[in-house]
C-alpha cells in the first residue's frame, strides 16, 4: 500500500529526525507530529549542560529549539499537535488517539522517549525536580541562581552535570548514590569509580552506598533523610535515578512491550506500518548481537531517521546497526564512551586516572575491542568508534594506542628541546 499519511508520535529529537528523513526521502504525503510538551522540538543535552551553566547576571541562555515555526510549516510541511500526549493506539483501524482526537495513519513512527523515575511521597514538596524537560531545566536554573543548597539524588550523568553547574556557581552541593560505585551500568565498575572521582577533585561531596529514606519539609523541601540516619539540609533536590520508556499509553494495543517496544533489527514492531525509535525502542543490534534500548542523543537521531525510511518503504527496510556513543560534560571535562561496557577486560592505555586530566580506557570481549572510554579525548574517541564498527581485533586496538602514545611522547620531547 502506498503511504499517504505518516504520523510521528514524540516531539523530541527522534521524532524530528523521522520527519526530516521522510521529506529528504521524497515523501510528499501528509505528516503529523504529536508531542506531549507545548514547546517546539528542542535539544535535550544542553538542558543539563550549557543551558544550566549560564551564570552571568543578565545573560539569558538561548532555548535550544531545533527549528522555528516557519521551518515546520513551510519547509517540512508538518501538522503539529503539541501540548497533549498520545493516549491510545488502535492498530486495526490505524488510529492514534490524543484525548478525544483521532488521527489516522498509513505509517506510524513511535518515538515517545522515556519518563523520569521519581521518589515516592515527594510530589507534595516544592523544590524537588527531575531534569527531563525544558521547564524542568528552567526551574532548576532559577533555584541554582538563588543559591539553593542542593542535593542531587543519583550520581549518573544527568545528576552529575547538575552538580557541576551548582559547583560552578559556588552553591553547596552533595550527590547521593545508592550503589557503592556510580555509573556501573554505563561504564563498568572500575571506570565508574574513575569518573566519579571528578566530584571529589572539584569539591563536590559524593556519598555512595546510601539510599534516601525520606524528603522532609513543610510544603517545600528542607531536608533529605538518608537510610543511614544522616540528614542533609536542602533547598533544592534534583532526582536523577533513571528513566523508564513511555509505553503505558500502548497497553492493550497489540504491540509487544518489554523494557520498551520490542522491535526487530529494522525497528519494526511486528505490527503492519508501525515502527519505533529512540529511548522507547528495544531492538537487536546486529553490531554486537544483543538486544539494546539506548537512551542517548546519537541513537535517537539515527533511529528516528531509519524508522521513518523503513516505515515508508517496508519492502526495502534496512537494519539499524550502530556502535553506541554518548558524552557528558562535568567540571570543564568531557567524558565520552563508544561501544558497550560488557567486557572481559578493561585496560587503561593512555594517562593516569588518579593524576591526569586526559586518559583513555579500552574494553575487550574475546579477541575484539568492544568499547572505549575517554576523559578529554575528543581527538581519538571517534577513531575507536570506527575500529569497533569495523570489528577490529584487540591487538589492532592496542597497536593503535601504542602508536598514539609514542607519537605524543615524541612531540613532547621535541617541544622541550
Please report, for each region that a protein language model flagged, where it lies by residue.
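N-terminal Rossmann-like FAD-binding beta1-loop-alpha1 element of flavoenzymes
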Residues: 4-27, 151, 158-167
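Rossmann-like dinucleotide-binding cores of NAD(P)H-dependent redox enzymes
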Residues: 149, 157-214, 296-299, 319-327
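FAD-site-proximal beta/loop scaffold in flavoenzymes
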Residues: 126-147, 219-225, 230-306
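Residue-level detector of alpha-helix initiation sites
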Residues: 12-16, 38, 114-116, 135, ...
Amino acid at each position: 500500500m502506498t503511504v499517504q499519511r505518516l504520523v510521528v508520535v514524540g516531539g523530541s529529537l527522534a521524532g524530528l529526525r523521522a520527519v526530516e528523513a521522510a521529506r529528504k526521502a521524497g515523501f510528499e504525503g501528509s505528516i503529523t507530529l504529536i508531542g506531549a510538551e507545548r514547546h517546539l522540538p528542542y535539544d535535550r543535552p544542553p538542558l543539563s549542560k550549557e543551558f544550566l551553566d549560564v551564570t552571568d547576571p543578565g545573560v539569558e541562555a538561548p532555548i535550544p529549539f531545533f527549528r522555528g515555526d516557519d521551518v515546520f510549516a513551510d519547509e517540512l510541511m508538518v501538522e503539529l499537535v503539541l501540548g497533549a500526549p498520545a493516549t491510545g493506539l488502535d492498530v486495526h483501524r490505524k488510529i492514534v488517539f490524543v484525548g478525544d482526537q483521532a488521527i489516522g495513519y498509513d505509517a506510524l513512527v513511535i518515538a515517545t522517549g522515556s519518563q523520569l523515575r521519581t521518589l515516592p511521597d515527594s510530589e507534595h514538596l516544592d523544590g524537588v525536580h527531575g531534569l527531563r524537560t525544558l521547564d524542568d531545566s528552567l526551574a532548576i536554573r532559577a533555584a541554582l541562581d538563588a543559591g539553593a543548597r542542593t542535593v542531587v539524588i543519583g550520581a549518573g550523568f544527568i545528576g552529575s552535570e547538575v552538580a557541576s553547574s551548582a559547583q560552578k556557581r559556588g552553591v553547596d552541593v552533595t550527590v547521593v548514590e545508592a550503589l557503592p560505585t556510580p555509573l556501573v551500568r554505563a561504564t563498568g565498575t572500575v571506570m565508574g569509580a574513575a569518573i566519579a572521582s571528578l566530584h571529589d577533585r572539584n569539591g563536590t561531596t559524593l556519598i555512595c552506598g546510601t539510599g534516601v529514606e525520606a524528603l522532609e519539609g513543610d510544603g517545600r523541601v528542607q531536608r533529605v533523610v538518608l537510610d543511614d540516619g544522616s540528614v542533609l539540609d536542602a533547598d533544592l533536590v534534583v532526582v536523577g535515578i533513571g528513566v523508564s520508556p513511555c509505553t503505558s499509553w500502548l497497553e492493550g494495543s497489540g504491540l509487544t512491550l518489554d523494557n520498551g517496544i520490542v522491535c526487530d533489527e529494522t525497528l519494526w514492531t511486528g505490527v503492519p506500518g508501525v515502527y519505533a525509535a529512540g529511548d522507547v525502542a528495544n531492538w537487536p543490534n546486529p553490531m554486537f548481537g544483543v538486544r539494546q534500548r539506548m537512551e542517548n542523543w546519537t541513537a535517537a537521531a539515527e533511529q528516528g531517521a531509519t524508522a521513518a525510511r523503513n516505515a515508508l518503504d517496508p519492502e526495502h527496510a534496512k537494519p539499524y546497526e550502530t556502535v553506541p556513543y554518548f558524552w557528558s560534560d562535568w567540571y570543564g571535562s568531557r567524558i565520552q564512551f563508544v561501544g558497550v561496557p560488557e567486557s572481559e577486560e578493561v585496560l587503561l592505555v593512555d594517562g593516569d586516572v588518579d593524576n591526569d586530566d586526559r586518559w583513555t580506557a579500552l574494553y575487550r570481549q574475546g579477541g575484539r575491542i568492544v568499547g572505549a572510554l575517554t576523559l578529554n579525548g575528543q581527538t581519538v574517541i571517534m577513531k575507536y568508534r570506527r575500529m569497533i564498527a569495523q570489528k577490529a581485533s584487540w591487538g589492532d586496538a592496542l597497536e593503535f594506542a601504542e602508536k598514539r602514545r609514542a607519537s605524543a611522547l615524541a612531540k613532547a620531547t621535541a617541544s622541550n628541546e
